[in-house]
Curated annotation (Swiss-Prot):
The keyword Hydrolase does not apply. Pfam families: E1_4HB, E1_FCCH, E1_UFD, ThiF, UBA_E1_SCCH. This is Ubiquitin-like modifier-activating enzyme 1. GO terms for molecular function: ATP binding; ubiquitin activating enzyme activity.
């Protein structure tokens, strides 16, 4: 997904402000953050029993409290075919207390279609016993055991959650009744070919602590009326985002102090900036200020038992285009259970006799259903299709339903997120051939091989086609691992002339293990692509997978060249950034290859399918850009912890990376100063002053010098600069209109006084001094006592605020000031910088920020720097966990969402491989497992454009053969003439990449020179780059006029040169 972590700030009540101003008392609110010494630093650790290194990304989805509840829950998973193993995998990765695997059956050939922890040599062995050691490897914190006896009541009593998969209805009803009456939460999951079913019963009194998982919202108050009800108006900088029925609390309100610290109150939204609260008519008059924060109030929800809900079901929709289908499938699945009980088997694949019988049974089930459930008209065609595919077992369907079911288990354990209430049905009938006559019973008969479960649905022809596919998988992270697993199960690229190429340049880290399930602890530091490829070969030894370690981009186009792409059947993205996604999208459009795109963000996920000449591309629509924080807010007027964390990240770069890089360039590049002077605004001054500081004014010789520097810098940032700001804008300052300057989003700061006994102050000095020492190659220290002793001898110069110092209140002011340059100061700097010749062999060591290493002082510095600044402005601080999320721009992630999303991707893959050509056969998908919400839509058709009577889309282009029959290349003049005669288009501008090759306003002399030059020669000269031997064609962009002189939009040109 293209979005970044949703990290809206929640405010908590702070100290009452002084009457008549927005200034808060000069004391700290940091006592709310626990400090636990670890690794020599005071770190905020929420719970020592949670391995934050392993569960890092999942903790940002669930939170510590939900995670703790998860760790006290034992879960039974009954049925270890493809669906059961998917659910077990996800909840083991999630970190429940213990998992017991139950199955009394033995592995059959058809199980290998989706059960990725069964091998061919396991045929005939108990599924639970074979799977147990392989599942146990996923998470050393979760004991996994196997049980092969009957599901008796004494055994069931040991579990908090019971999951039944692929079980008879008789067993479901018996177990369901027992679980409901004994407070055991129940999940029933079933998949039949292209159909899936899910049922949840979490008891009559489940406490839901958080229904959506979103960070609580907060907003700044600008007005509260004395009324019944009182109306709250928020600052118009941003919409408040609340909904009617939300509960809120208030803090920092001046005047109407009765609101501060009051019990959470329910609101009614009146508009994007207003809402009503309780009766405020007897409260004090509102003066100014205040923060309103959403409060998540626990609520009780009640479930019916399985027998009761079977008779009177409630449905969660998965596809609003199939509105009546859940009720029809509710009848169909009951009929299927009756059929299986009568015959001891599922209906035979695509057998008309069994399909007719299932329709008859379904009619009988419908007839005896309660009136509210009874279907006036049974969809017999749907029931027949259920019969046709019910014997099938598809890995993608299991991945989707298994991801959902595992998330429901986590909801049952933790009380976090809204459960499915209570039935969910899903189908993917669009995956069947568009030619309804293509499948016959003969084609779907079992072959006694690992793909029998899939052949039962799609026949043997598609299986052969899947094996011959050549696919490029870009990324081997969480989505990449799940894709490879599904590819292995469905047989993609498993025939002699098939292949999957997977590329990923990353190595495995501990935090990956929680959701990138192909990796194990002993794989940490190994290459992802190699390890993932080896792991899926264990799942299906026939898969032909080649691993690369290349980043996709212009620099690897000699590897992923024309030959490479032309041999592909399609591309699947498993990327984590928008730039790489857009690059691969452009390559797929150029080479006209299908692209399967997906992404996740916590419990949210999306799938997009891109089909040549049919759909729009990934880049056709984009998310709006993220709202950036104004520079002046960061520098002088922060009001949220996000502001102080971004400021701390900027500090890190400006202290420990950029100066060192600039010094090294100054010492090695003779043109560095000349190049720096050409930078815009005040940048030349800032860069050269930083170089002078690093080489002359602040260059340390010893560790003690680094401690002194850190102490001085502490005073500059948290005392001196704040005192200067308050000198310029005193607490009682008024604006030109007479309003208090320190009001609204401007929080009045106060300076801090350094105290070596304050853990946070010492944290800052130790982290800053160690990082500063690293940039000079000096050895640091973690000895807190020794550093405290050194600090006692540091002399801090007395600071007196200066008059005439300009502090900019807005970014517009700042930009105006940056336009003027102090040339005399620049000349002085150039003269005083030491000559590189005088510093032979000297170099500095820039530090790249790395958030996941708790021993490198990076996050120690960020947390201390941010929370000290937050203390300056009386902003509630953030613990290390939250700080890492925001400063590290971490994308929350959980295995359940990934599994479900990839299941949907591979359903689209079935359609792509079959060559579906109807737009309504494909489905773009969006889901949010927390709500739960599912939305599917047809992909948008590629937008159509026109010049003259010629229609075109992004998939069309002009094909121009650069080499002429006589072996000579086309010149610019010939190129321009070709378009005039062949297409009646007059080219007004012509470019290749960022290079302008021709324009109507080009100087006559330059134009005359170029007209007779070959096109490739012009490209090389203008771009100052030689064309590589792998380049067979150039992409040229045109601006054109038609014969009437009107500007017309036209496709690009593919200009072939070899």
């Amino acid at each position: 997904m293209s979005s970044s972590p949703l990290s809206k700030k929640r405010r908590v009540s702070g100290p009452d402000p002084k009457p008549g101003s927005n200034c808060s008392p000069a004391h700290s609110v940091l006592s709310e953050v626990p400090s636990v010494p670890a690794n020599g630093m005071a770190k905020n650790v929420s719970d020592a029993d949670i391995d934050e290194g392993l569960y890092s990304r999942q903790l940002y989805v669930l939170g510590h409290e939900a995670m703790k509840r998860l760790q006290t829950s034992s879960v039974l998973v009954s049925g270890l075919r493809g669906l059961g193993v998917e659910i077990a995998k996800n909840i083991i990765l999630g970190g429940v207390k213990a998992v017991t695997l139950h199955d009394q059956g033995t592995a059959q050939w058809a199980d290998l279609s989706s059960q990725f922890y069964l091998r061919e040599e396991d045929i005939g062995k108990n599924r639970a016993e074979v799977s147990q050691p392989r599942l146990a490897e996923l998470n050393s914190y979760v004991p996994v055991s196997a049980y092969t006896g009957p599901l008796v009541e004494d055994f069931l009593s040991d579990f908090q959650v019971v999951v039944l998969t692929n079980s008879p209805l008789e067993d479901q009803l018996r177990v369901g009744e027992f679980c409901h009456s004994h407070g055991i939460k129940l999940v029933v999951a079933d998949t039949r070919g292209l159909f899936g079913q899910l049922f949840c019963d979490f008891g009559e009194e489940m406490i839901l602590t958080d229904s959506n998982g979103e960070q609580p919202l907060s907003a700044m108050v600008s007005m509260v009326t004395k009324d019944n009800p009182g109306v709250v108006t928020c600052l118009d900088e941003a919409r408040h985002g609340f909904e009617s029925g939300d509960f809120v609390s208030f803090s920092e309100v001046q005047g109407m102090i009765e609101l501060n610290g009051s019990q959470p109150m329910e609101i009614k939204v009146l508009g994007p900036y207003t809402f009503s609260i309780c009766d405020t008519s007897n409260f004090s008059d509102y003066i100014r200020g205040g923060i309103v924060s959403q409060v998540k109030v626990p609520k009780k929800i009640s479930f019916k038992s399985l027998p009761a809900s079977l008779a009177e079901p409630d449905f969660v929709m998965t596809d609003f285009a199939k509105y009546s289908r859940p009720a029809q499938l509710h009848i169909g699945f009951q009929a299927l259970h009756h059929f299986c009980a009568q015959h001891g088997r599922s209906p035979r694949p695509h057998n008309e006799e069994d399909a007719a019988e299932l329709v008859t049974i379904a009619q009988a089930v419908n007839a005896r259903s309660l009136p509210a459930v009874q279907q006036g008209s049974l969809d017999e065609d749907l029931i027949r299709k259920l019969a046709y595919v019910a014997a099938g077992d598809l890995a993608p369907i299991n991945a989707f339903i298994g991801g959902l079911a595992a998330q429901e288990v986590m909801k049952a354990c933790s009380g976090k997120f809204m459960p499915i209430m209570q039935w969910l049905y899903f189908d993917a009938l669009e995956c069947l051939p568009e030619d309804k006559e293509a499948l016959t019973e003969d084609k779907c008969l079992p072959r006694q091989n690992r793909y029998d479960g899939q052949v039962a649905v799609f026949g043997s022809d598609l299986q052969e086609r899947l094996g011959k596919q050549k696919y490029f998988l870009v990324g081997a992270g969480a989505i990449g691992c799940e894709l490879l697993k599904n590819f292995a199960m469905i047989g993609l690229g498993c025939a002699e002339d098939g292949e999957i190429v997977v590329t990923d340049m990353d190595t495995i880290e501990k935090s990956n293990l929680n959701r990138q399930f192909l990796f194990r602890p002993w794989d940490v530091t190994k290459l992802k692509s190699d390890t993932a490829a080896a792991a899926v070969r264990q799942m299906n030894p026939h898969i032909r997978v080649t691993s690369h370690q290349n980043r996709v981009g212009p620099d690897t186009e000699r590897i992923y060249d024309d030959d490479f792409f032309q041999n592909l059947d399609g591309v699947t993205n498993a990327l984590d950034n928008v730039d790489a996604r857009m690059y691969m999208d452009r390559r797929c459009v150029y080479y006209r290859k299908p692209l399967l795109e997906s992404g996740t963000l916590g419990t949210k996920g999306n799938v997009q399918v891109v089909i040549p000449f049919l759909t729009e591309s990934y880049s056709s629509s984009q998310d709006p850009p993220e709202k950036s924080i104004p520079i002046c807010t960061l520098k002088n007027f922060p009001n949220a912890i996000e502001h102080t964390l971004q400021w701390a990240r900027d500090e890190f770069e400006g202290l420990f990376k950029q100066p060192a890089e600039n010094v090294n360039q100054y010492l090695t590049d003779p043109k560095f100063v000349e190049r720096t002077l050409r930078l815009a605004g005040t940048q030349p001054l800032e860069v050269l002053e930083a170089v002078q500081r690093s080489l002359v004014l602040q260059r340390p010789q010893t560790w003690a010098d680094c401690v002194t520097w850190a102490c001085h810098h502490w005073h500059t940032q948290y005392s001196n600069n704040i005192r200067q700001l308050l000198h310029n804008f005193p607490p009682d300052q008024l604006t030109s209109s007479g309003a208090p300057f320190w009001s609204g989003p401007k929080r009045c700061p106060h300076p801090l006084t350094f105290d070596v006994s304050n853990p946070l102050h010492l944290d800052y000095v130790i982290a800053a001094a160690n990082l500063f020492a690293q940039t000079y190659g000096l050895t640091g220290s973690q000895d807190r006592a020794a550093v405290a002793t050194l600090l006692q001898s540091v002399q801090v110069p007395e600071f007196t605020p200066k008059s005439g110092v300009k502090i900019h209140v807005s970014d517009q002011e700042l930009q105006s000031a940056n336009a003027s340059v102090d040339d005399s100061r620049l000349e002085e700097l150039k003269a005083t910088l030491p000559s590189p010749e005088k510093l032979p062999g000297f170099k500095m060591y820039p530090i790249d920020f790395e958030k996941d290493d708790d021993t490198n002082f990076h996050m120690d510095f960020i947390v201390a720097a941010s929370n000290l600044r937050a203390e300056n402005y009386d902003i509630p601080p953030a613990d290390r966990h939250k700080s890492k999320l925001i400063a590290g721009k971490i994308i929350p992630a959980i295995a359940t969402t990934t599994a479900a999303v990839v299941g949907l991707v591979c359903l689209e893959l079935y359609k792509v491989v079959q060559g579906h050509r109807q737009l309504n056969s494909y489905k773009n998908g969006f889901l949010n497992l927390a709500l739960p919400f599912f939305g599917f839509s047809e992909p948008l058709a590629a937008p159509r454009h026109q010049y003259y009577n010629q229609e075109w889309t992004l998939w069309d282009r002009f094909e121009v053969q650069g080499l002429q029959p006589n072996g000579e290349e086309m010149t610019l003049k010939q190129f321009l003439d070709y378009f005039k005669t062949e297409h009646k288009l007059e080219i007004t501008m012509l470019s290749q990449g960022v290079s302008m090759l021709y324009s109507f306003f080009m100087p006559a002399a330059k134009l005359k020179e170029r007209l007779d030059q070959p096109m490739t020669e012009i490209v090389s000269r203008v771009s100052k780059r030689k064309l590589g031997r792998h380049v067979r064609a150039l992409v040229l962009e045109l601006c054109c006029n038609d014969e009437s002189g009107e500007d017309v939009e036209v496709p690009y040109v593919r200009y072939t040169i070899r």
